[in-house]
């Protein structure tokens, strides 16, 4: 994003009620965007049967969405700075609604994946813009931290409740209904945005960086395609090796080219701030772990245990319910005490959840299974507010939108990698089911446990005095 969001006059002129309405509208947009990352997971088995899709086709159904979000969030944010945030916000809602309609009408997996791309294009116009509006509407530091905490909590809640809502919809109305439900929500949000969200533009919008944008898409696309298709082509395939080489060259290009631009797509100097750079890595770790958990769990519950979609969704209640309680408390705790404790709790819960999932087998009592899922709920409830706060709080207001966009990019990249990696690990075992599937999933659970440990360690490393000083130096530079 860029230099200014809401002008001081506009911001200070908003009443507390108007600010609350703006926050609510932004949260509604995040609910549909984030929920569509997870709500689709519980519908995957039904989609696969109805559309005769392969495991890689199902992976792309999830990853086409999160990959586009990861690749174009920053571009959409800077575009909103130039042409107006409310305008881009409303266009994004309309594109998301149209994509949802087309997903619901899909006659085949190719159509569905293409419609998911359109959905994601709309989503890229909602995520960074809504966060920038929230961050700049609430100017008082404590008030801002609470608002960002609510915003982050809503994101986590939507991610957790997606499979539960999706299970009920699939059971009652079929898998297409998980897309159609977005349409009335989007329509209400478009009207409310027109009525209550003030239009704003940046005083100096960041210029479009086509080379940086292309390099980012090349890196993300090459890595994800290589991971997903490695199951069929093999890791030693010239195609797979070539894709990783292309990704490495893309990273080198970013490191060489971006620092030379006045308005780079990726503001690499922000990464000198330890809290900020740690927040990006933790966002990637968190959603990589949770994306892998959801992808494996929904298929385990339905394809291995034979549960109906609604029952599978209800088994994930222990993931969603803690978010309702923990996220608001975490937001207040971050505002009052900082992000250290929530990050350590979140990382520890994810690590324990991954480690304990190693004992899940085809006949493990469901009570024991859902008890383990509770750990993932604790993790999700605690992780989002401190990550969002760490990414933004140390930055000047002029960089808040860009910092938030990069944090969101880390989340979406994490989801994409989590689905790609977990699908590659369990894909060959899915047709066999039973013990073959649960044994193959051990690789996923070890990965999830390691990611949780990484979040806890980074939480400690990024909140000390030295880390805080690096954030202050970056903000002043």
Language-model features and meaning:
Residues 78-211, 363, 397:
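Helix-loop-helix hairpins in multi-pass membrane proteins, especially solute transporters
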Residues 3, 183-202, 217-229, 246-261, ...:
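C-terminal membrane-cytosol helix-exit motif in multi-pass small-molecule transporters
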Residues 1-18, 202, 462-477:
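Intrinsic disorder in cytosolic terminal tails and internal cytosolic loops
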Residues 47-48, 79-80, 165-173, 227, ...:
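Interfacial helix-cap and linker-helix signal at transmembrane-aqueous boundaries
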Residues 63-77, 127-132, 317-330:
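Central cavity-lining transmembrane alpha-helices of secondary-active solute carriers
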Residues 20-42, 55, 238-250, 259-470, ...:
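12-transmembrane solute porter fold
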Residues 73-85, 170, 325-339:
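Helix-to-loop junctions at the C-terminal end of transmembrane segments
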Residues 43-72, 111-113, 305, 310-315:
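Extracellular/periplasmic helix-loop-helix junction of adjacent transmembrane segments
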